Amino acid sequence: MSSSPDVLVVGAGLAGLSCARQLHEKGVSIQILEASDGIGGRVRTDHLHGFLLDRGFQVLFTAYPEAQRLLNYPLLDLRSFAHGALSWFAGGMNKLVDPWRTPGSWKDALQSDFGSLTDKLRIARLRRRLRNSSTDEIFCRPDRPTKDALQSEGFSKEIIHRFFRPLLGGILLDGKLNASSRMFEFVFKMLSEGSVCVPSHGMGAIPIQLAEKLPAGSIRLNARVDALHENELTLAGGESLRARALVIAADGLSAAHLVGEVEPASRSVTCFYYSAQEPPVPLPILILNGDGAGPVNNFCVISQIAPSYAPQGKHLISVTVLGTQALTDVQLGGFIIAQMKNWFGKVASSWQLLRSYRIAHAQPQQLPGALEPPQRPIRIRPGIYVCGDHRANASINGALVSGTRAAEAVYSDLSR
């Protein structure tokens, strides 16, 4: 590896890996500097006693256009959630069936308590409209809070509260539905066009696959960048590195610090993982908190989706709480188990806590107006570029697209 590569990339998250890989494929020499002890950024998987613990509940939407272009889905061995969801309200579990992807389910879908017939017809209308819209069209539409968009579609208060609030709360980390309506429409389009999956070896398999095509020695771990000046980076230990181009692919807060921008607002989330002897729900399905009571927003038995997430004879339960609570793990865990006992009975008392993750900066906030323009500038000043989901949209697709745009800008400039 040359001591002076053409490009230094700061951050081995999805955006940085996407950028570096595409530059390498064009014959540009690169080196990635990663502050932590591993690649993936926020998309990492820990191994604990035979369990696979993603750092927060995460999924891959197979319809993501850039993921389809850059990732090899068969090699990821993707395992799919069932289409639809369960939602707890009115003292019981209620099933929302996706009749478009579940053969023979139209009767069940129309007869379920999940919204009125009018609500279901409006979901069909929304689904058709978004499937007929390109992602570029969606991100150029007038922006407003998601709750306003749902109300303007004519959805009832009941289905907004029981379905859209916890579903979008889990995806956009926004239980109040204040996030950009552009993000809501993009997410709903992706849900309508593809599956929701996890790789059999954990979400961390995604960055590993991106990194596999990079040259040996091109990723340097535990290399925190403290400052940049023109075409030079200074590491935490005082070492200086130079390159023809610098790509800042760090998280939004770190990137803002390095390039002198205002720190972007972000959303936080908490995830608790439990080990269980038996699955409380023997289905590979997402479970939503439709009545809003208690801390848990969404829940799943992740080993029902991907059995490899748990050792033989055990099951892995993932519980998502929006925000990072001031409570201790013991206190919050007590409230979680109390809520789960209400849903599933005393069996929840036997669950064993494996680990909790409190992620203060899980996603860019992206309120209405934050996605204007839909793609923020990549080229900050001559020789310095910034990429990440905070430059596009809060999704795996946004991170990958941003990395691609950075690679294209760098290659164009270096080729002049």
Predicted regions and their residues:
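Mobile amphipathic helical/loop "lid" adjacent to a hydrophobic cofactor/ligand pocket
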Residues: Y64-Q68, N72, L76-L177
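Helical element adjacent to the flavin cofactor pocket in flavoenzyme catalytic cores
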Residues: F184-E232, L241-R244
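Glycine-rich FAD pyrophosphate-binding loop
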Residues: H24-L48
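Mid-domain catalytic core of redox enzymes
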Residues: D226-G334, A338-W343
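Glycine-rich active-site loop/strand segments that organize a redox cofactor
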Residues: V43-T62, A124-D136
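N-terminal Rossmann-like FAD-binding beta1-loop-alpha1 element of flavoenzymes
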Residues: P5-I32, Y411
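Conserved flavin/dinucleotide-binding core of flavoenzymes
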Residues: S308-R416
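Short beta-strand to alpha-helix junction loop
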Residues: Q58-P65, R141-P142, E153, K189-A211, ...
